Each structure stands twice: as C-alpha cells, then as structure tokens.
Amino acid sequence: MTATCSALRAASLVALAVVGEAAVKVPAPLKAVDPLRASVVSVRITGQEWNWRTPWAKQAPWNRVVTGLVVPGPRILVASAAFGNHLLIEVQKLGRDERWPARVRLADSEGPLALLEVDDPSFWAGLAPLPLAETVPVSGEVKVYRWLSSGQFDAATANVRQVRAARHGLSRVTFTSLDMTSAMEAGDSEVVVGEGKALGLVTSRAGDNLIAMAAPVLRQFLAAAAEPTYRGFARAGLAWQEMVNPALREYLGLLPGEGGVRLTRVLPHGSGAGVLEAGDVLLRVGDAPIDATGHYEHPLYGRLSCAPLFTEGRRPGDSLELGILRNRERLTVHVTLRRMLPEQERVPPYVIGQGPDYVVRGGLVFQELTGPYLTAASEGGRRPAPRLLIAVDREGAVPDPARPRLVVLASVLPDVANLGFQDLRDLIVTKVNGAVIGSLQDLRGAFASPV
C-alpha cells in the first residue's frame, strides 16, 4: 500500500512539473482588444494663458481632457485649439489610470489639428490605428466615442443631418464638415465612426447639434504632415456678396439663370491677390460653377459653400483656374493658392505660443491690438471700445508695410503722477514725438528720440 502511494505521489509530481513547464512555454492567449477601444485615447492638457489686460502676468493654469485618434506612425490625431499655450500633455489608453507624457509633433491652429507623439513604446502596446473614411455619409446613424474619466468607454448615437461647410475653433479656413444631432455633450475631438471607419472628429456643440471635421480633411492634414515641409491649408482670402438683386445682375452683365458672386474684398496676402479685383464676379472655381449665393453642387454631398474649393484636395503653391466676369467680359484666370497665417494680418485674430508684447512708459501701458486683447476687453460684461471694433473691421485683415500693427494705449497705471489720466484706455496711437507708430518697435524708437 505504501509503495503504491509513493508511486502515485511521484507520478503526480511529474505531471505537475510537465504542466508547469508547458505553462511557461505556451502562455495563455491575451484577450483581444476591441478595435474601437484600441484606437481611441484620452489626452490630458495642462496649460496657462496670458492675461492680456495686465500683459506681464499670467492667468491661473487650466486643465482640459480631449479625445485622440490613433493614426499610423504611430501618432495621435487631435482636433482641438488647446495646443500652443500648453505646459504639459499626458495620454491615457484603454480606460486605465496610468499616464504617459506626450509631445506635439505638429499643430496647425488653422485646423485646428495636432499630431502628438509618445516616446515610450509601452504606451502603444494594445493600440492600433482606425482607418479614416475616404467619404462621409450625408444622412443616417453613426456612433461617437470617447473615454470618460471613470475609465468607461462612452458611446452615443448621432444622426447625420447634412454635410456642410464650417469653420472650427479659431480657424478662418472653411472645411467640409459633418452636421449631426446627438445627446452626447461632445465638442472635444470625440471620434465619429461609421462602418468601422473614422468619419470625423467633433469640434463643437450647440444644444444637441454637433459639428465634426470630416475624414477627408483629416486625411489631407496627415498627408501634408508626412511631407518634408508642412505647407498647411490654403485659403481664398476673399469676401463676396450674393448676386440675387436683379438690377445689380443686369448692371454687371450676368445672363438670366447665370450664377456667380461679386467680390467685395481681395486680401493682399490671400490666394486671389494680384489676379482678382474687388468688383469681379466669381463664376467658377476649377470645374465647379458657382451659384448666385456662393454655393456649388458637390457630386457626393450636394449643395456646399464654394470656400472649401480653395482648400480641400489642394495645397498652398498649387495653381487654380477661375472663371470671372470683369467689366462685362468673361475671363479665365489662374491664382496661386496661399496659406494665410494670423501673424500676417494687421490685427492678428489669435496669438498662439507666446504672450503679449508691451511697453510701459510713465505709467502708460501700450500693446499691439490683437484678437486676445479684444476678448479680454469684453470680459466682465464690458464691451470693447467701438473705435477698436471699427478699426478691426476696416483694417484688421489688411497688411500694411508702413504700419504692420495697430498700437493702443491699453491702460494707465494708478499713480499720483497720472491723476486725471486713469480712465484712458483702448486708444489707437498714431504718432509719438512726430514719428508714425506702426508697431511697438516704432514706439520704443520714438520714445528714445524725444523732440
């Protein structure tokens, strides 16, 4: 009996050893990760804005969580204007608490789009890109995805109302976009998915209405980012009026049923500069006829604004053929597409990655007029000075080599020496000591050369 038990015990030990050896050599298969969960990540951004009313100070730091889409590289694609004044970027995956540091490889505020990189290879384990759709639907149900701070993978149904042209964030560029309705409180780059492909990234919400940058635009951004030199998005730089007034149409020489819009402004740093003129009637962009309200018929999406025709599928430096009506004569002209940066404008609409420049002299605080300055001037229920709004409307977008910027007396510091002047603010400075002022550099020079 004892010999039998010993034999059984020895056999059991041998069996356990074999099983243990097999367990080491052949690990249990990993649980498959849902492709959607594997392609959507959370991006945590910590940033700090400058105080444009007291330009030597900063505001309190802020934190924001947005959604990122894994794309080939591997990299993370985000549609958000939160990059530029950021201090720290961290990413999370698969609903876990662990955070990895990330950095911006490329950010274009005219998207607004950004590509992030994560150097730690362990972050990419279990993640995979989700294909970007080549086209987007004009109707039907889609899904919107994101990770919640609780670690839950959140999904909501959205109904596509239409595909239309829209601007996103701070951008002045008009893109093809998805217009949807959904109960999700989105607007932070949530991923829109249909038939297993990414259809877009949500950038804004109004009520139950969501606007997403469409996948073809995202594909164009990634293609541009892969080039040795990033060229960005082209923009027309045109303003126009609709041609629905019969008397005006007849005066300009438009035929019955003929479309076209009348150009009211051609910016000197835009794509139409040197070729188009205010008063021209834009009849055609490429092969697309323009109707009397500035729309054209897209082969897939129907009636869209003609503005994206200068941007999508084309890059800065490309030549674009236009049909115009000038002095009752129909002409074919070619323009070279240009990227229009905010710093090229006399009043930059936004400032990214740097604080305000300023000059303090005798307790007087001077700044250059910018979009953030106007925003700060409207805080606390106040309204910006009408003179500033008029200046921005008339001159803000038009570069002037002689006066590249508008300098303003922003405020007066409280001091006994400044009694009686303490209420002066938001005044445009044109001359100091007889010198024309077109920048803070001019102002410094004028103060250094008293009359």
Spell out what each predicted region is.
Residues 27-30, 50-80, 98-101, 127-128, ...:
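A conserved glycine-rich beta-strand in the N-terminal activation segment of trypsin-fold
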Residues 27-35, 43, 124, 198-256, ...:
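C-terminal cap/linker of serine protease catalytic domains
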Residues 39-44, 119-128, 154-207, 212, ...:
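Active-site region of chymotrypsin-like
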Residues 43, 68, 74, 78, ...:
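Terminal peptide-recognition signature
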Residues 59, 181-191, 241-291, 381-438:
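PDZ/PDZ-like domain segments forming the peptide/carboxylate-binding groove
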Residues 72-154, 177, 181-182, 186, ...:
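Conserved active-site neighborhood of the chymotrypsin/trypsin-like protease fold
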Residues 82, 216, 284-323, 431-451:
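PDZ domains, with a preference for the canonical peptide-binding region formed by the helix
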Residues 106, 125-175, 202-212, 222-232, ...:
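Flexible, gly/ser-rich surface segments that form the specificity/activation loops bordering the active-site cleft
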